[in-house]
UniProtKB/Swiss-Prot annotation:
GO cellular component, one term: cytoplasm
Cofactor: pyridoxal 5'-phosphate
One GO MF term attached to the UniProt entry: pyridoxal phosphate binding
InterPro entries referenced in this protein's UniProt entry, alphabetically: 4pyrrol_synth_GluAld_NH2Trfase, Aminotrans_3, Aminotrans_3_PPA_site, PyrdxlP-dep_Trfase, PyrdxlP-dep_Trfase_major, PyrdxlP-dep_Trfase_small
Protein name: Glutamate-1-semialdehyde 2,1-aminomutase
PANTHER family registered for this protein in UniProt: GLUTAMATE-1-SEMIALDEHYDE 2,1-AMINOMUTASE, GLUTAMATE-1-SEMIALDEHYDE 2,1-AMINOMUTASE 1, CHLOROPLASTIC-RELATED
Length: 426
């Protein structure tokens, strides 16, 4: 047995499923998950000593690559001053100033510890601000594991074949309306059915938890218009897309102005950080200035703030997002070319530093049903054969891939060459 197999066997006796987040268990592809010893640049190194070109990037945060010296040094320097204070720090102010400067729609920002905390808190704030209870989310989108959001959830719940998670009371779920991503008619129908009851829409601007599905040109502006028409707030969940699709996020890339924005992943530089923010009048409703309660023992943790501040300063450097886009486009085009040579039907969606691989005869993948019609079994074989080639993709047909600026042209070419060999075996 490999060391990963031994560790996984031991882990399953101690940790549910052997992992601390379900998708890591390889449930969506089968087999034994890799146990990682270290990472550097574009590469992961497992406990058995094998190196992999990494397109998971810790599920999104590692836009600069692993073990970036600026982030590492910032963490070391901050740790020397103490690990946690439970009191305000100067770095929290600097971080808030940086985030609100980079994302102009955020007049104010509140730091939390995860993307789930960010979305959960933003929805509570929207409900408190509007005095309404119902929310709209979209089938196949994932916004964390809060009860009100695990209703026809995407991501791991798709892989597990559970459109609704057990443990979510029906009384919670009844306030969550699930519409069809990229279908404005379904959203209008929800508003017309409950014109005075919907507090907010929460949406991934690029659906990254049913692989990678970009919005149709009219979709996000249409959501903005519907929120304005019916007096609801628009929450854009940029936990995945923030600072990756564009410096100011997918909202800037697609030209839509939300009332609230949720951030995570890149904002922490690899540390556990989330944030939510937006219009000043809405944020003023948050405790302690307003009646909507939210708190966190480790929110604004000095180590996490130092990591995030260093990361965002690097991400804001000129050329970063152009490089991300160029590398991702090169990979997508190379995979399509290699698949065509092998007569393998393939669609590759990509936006900025995100991409999605779909085995399908369809010309495009735009809707939830398009994703669900893809050949998951072929993806499983593709995943394992690529892993043997030293390429680590997301271990699920329903998760996006992530590029970093640490990936080189050689890494991209080696990945395409590996895919060419794998396609010949499928």
């Amino acid at each position: 047995m490999s060391k990963s197999e031994n560790l996984y066997s031991a882990a399953r006796e101690l940790i549910p499923g052997g992992v601390n987040s379900p998708v890591r268990a390889f449930t969506g592809v089968g087999g034994t998950p890799l146990f990682i010893e270290k990472a550097d640049g574009a590469y992961l190194y497992d406990v058995d000593g094998k190196a992999y070109i990494d397109y998971v990037g810790s599920w999104g945060p590692m836009v600069l690559g692993h073990n970036h010296p600026a982030i590492r040094n910032a963490v070391i320097e901050a740790a020397e001053r103490g690990l946690s204070f439970g009191a305000p720090t100067e770095m929290e102010v600097k971080m808030a100033e940086l985030v609100t400067n980079l994302v102009p729609t955020m007049d104010m920002v509140r730091m939390v510890n995860s993307g789930t905390e960010a979305t959960m808190s933003a929805i509570r704030l929207a409900r408190g601000f509007t005095g309404r209870d119902k929310i709209i989310k979209f089938e196949g989108c994932y916004h964390g594991h809060a009860d009100c959001l695990l209703v026809k959830a995407g991501s791991g719940a798709l892989t597990l074949g559970q459109p609704n998670s057990p443990g979510v009371p029906a009384d919670f779920a009844k306030h969550t309306l699930t519409c069809t991503y990229n279908d404005l008619a379904s959203v209008r129908a929800a508003f017309e059915q409950y014109p005075q009851e919907i507090a907010c829409i929460i949406v991934e601007p690029v659906a990254g938890n049913m692989n990678c599905v970009p919005p149709l040109p009219e979709f996000l502006p249409g959501l903005r218009a519907l929120c304005d028409e019916f007096g609801a707030l628009l929450i854009i969940d940029e936990v995945m897309t923030g600072f990756r699709v564009a410096l100011a996020g997918a909202q800037d890339y697609y030209g839509v102005v939300p009332d609230l924005t949720c951030l995570g992943k890149i904002i922490g530089g690899g540390m556990p950080v989330g944030a939510f923010g937006g219009r000043r009048d809405v944020m003023d409703a948050l405790a302690p200035t307003g009646p909507v309660y939210q708190a966190g023992t480790l929110s604004g943790n000095p180590i996490a703030m130092a990591a995030g501040f260093a990361c965002l300063n690097e991400v804001a450097q000129p050329g970063i997002h152009e490089t991300l886009d160029e590398l991702t486009t090169r990979l997508a085009e190379g995979l399509l070319e290699a698949a065509e040579e092998a007569n393998i039907p393939l669609v590759v969606n990509h936006v900025g530093g995100m991409f999605g691989i779909f085995f399908t005869d369809a010309e495009s993948v735009t809707y939830y049903q398009d994703v669900m019609a893809c050949d998951v079994e072929r993806f499983k074989r593709f995943f394992h054969l690529m892993l043997e080639e030293g390429v680590y993709l997301a271990p699920s047909a329903f998760e996006a891939g992530f590029m970093s600026v640490a990936h080189s042209e050689e890494d991209i070419n080696n990945t395409i060459d590996a895919a060419r060999r794998v396609f010949a075996k499928l």
